[in-house]
Amino acid sequence: MPRQLLLRRIRRVVAIAALLGSVATPVLAQAAPAAKAGESCSKSQVNKKSGSLTCTYSAKTKNYTWVAAAASTTSKKNWPSKLVVAAVPSENVATMTLRYKNFVDVIQKETGVPTTFISATDYAGVIEAQVAGRADIVFYGPFSYVLAKARGAKIEAIGASVPTATTAQGYYLSYLVSKKSNTSINALKDVKGKNVCFVDAASTSGFLYPTAGLLKEGIQSTEYSSVFAGGHDKSVLAVQAGTCDAGFVYDDMFDILLPQRGLINAADFKVVWKSGQIPNSPMAVRKDLPSDLFEIIKKTILEKINKTSFVSMGLCTNEATCNVIEDATWGFKSVTDARYDDVRQVCEATKSSRCR
């Protein structure tokens, strides 16, 4: 074979081999740069990990950032095998259990302790559960919280419910409602000789403040027939059914919740009395829990149990439809026991045996 032809063939083979080599050898994709603690991340990345970092949303700063998992400073020594969340009954048990699902899930996630929700059939049952140490975290009414403390519950009010993120302290009202068609009841004094629905003997807006209002009008409990409905919703529904001539209820239950659910037509009712401002309800935690666990629960309730955080965690699609514990609650703001001294003063004014 001529030398030149041989050289051309050798060059062709070398070229083909080089081409095949470049195809066969994969080009390594350049790795994405690792996230650094404190750097910004996005809403779509929340709760996702990059190495040892997690994309976290802060309701305080309203920023998404990569955060390193804190080194465990707790041994979890003497921690309970489970946590129990409870609440005084404002509605039926099934509805309340559903409403507290996200709350329970977040407490369980942040503490790592299996968490369940219970709702007793009356306020006394919830108070007794926390006095006996069978309930760890309880959402009380102001009066039932005062009663629990007075009866020996080792608890601390760590947060009170607020309707918006910008509300420092919230208040609510007690209403007395009657059917519009009932022309005999147009004011608080008109309950004489009538069947009156209260909620529970340990309810703030469903008993204590109404009782104080009646006494201020000079009306004694012997001058009307008391019916304890067992829930704020049940009080209004009993008026609707004609079981009671009038009933006491907290404002948002009547103004928002019952109409939203189609259970009443507000136009069929009239509000014949409103109380003064009542400090919003507290979330109380057992002080005899291990201190490190107590602090985790407190931090979680104040920073992560709110509509803004629930949306960022993917538990809600938006704040407008998000439920924390009830539709009217955005979340919780720090509170102290002294905030409920007004409730204690109302108790003193009524001289009611229920206050003991």
Annotate each language-model stretch with its function:
Residues 85-108, 120, 143, 166-237, ...:
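Bilobed "Venus flytrap"/periplasmic-binding protein-like clamshell domains
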Residues 114-121, 137-139, 222-231, 270-273:
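Short beta-strand-to-loop elements that line the ligand-binding cleft
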Residues 1-31:
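Secretory targeting and sorting signals
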Residues 77-86, 91-102, 285-356:
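An extracytoplasmic/periplasmic, membrane-proximal ligand-sensing/linker region
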Residues 139-153, 212-216, 240-241, 245-266:
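A ligand-binding cleft/hinge motif common to bilobed small-molecule-binding domains
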Residues 155-169, 222-225, 258-277:
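Short beta-strand->loop
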Residues 49-57:
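Extracellular disulfide-bonded cysteine-rich modules/repeats
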Residues 32-43:
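Secreted/surface-exposed cysteine- and glycine-rich disulfide frameworks
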